[in-house]
């Protein structure tokens, strides 16, 4: 992903593709959690000016820890509820829940309860969610594109 989610459509995707990157996870909201692309499944970006698909896969970012802790100012308990609703919405629609978690949330004084939030969310989700790598999501997406055209 691009740091601070700094992104320029479609230029960033072109640059990433030229650098050999297979996928990106920058397309999300910094100030609120949710589905910036309308859903959370893989997609192949499209350059409207050149009228062509770009050679990179976008895995839209659904939620980021800092968004809930800083921008939305949610206490840790409410963040768990919010993550769970977003995960459920992603699963229901067949998407992937891309979560960005920073190591700075280890600071219990600055972000009380947030490290526990991540652990709770991961362990609670383990019974229902399937945890996969971005590489696997890309492989499955490309396979579907080949078989469905």
Locate the predicted segments by residue.
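Active-site-adjacent pocket scaffolds in enzyme catalytic domains
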Residues: 1-90
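C-terminal domain-boundary segment and adjacent tail
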Residues: 31, 41, 77-149
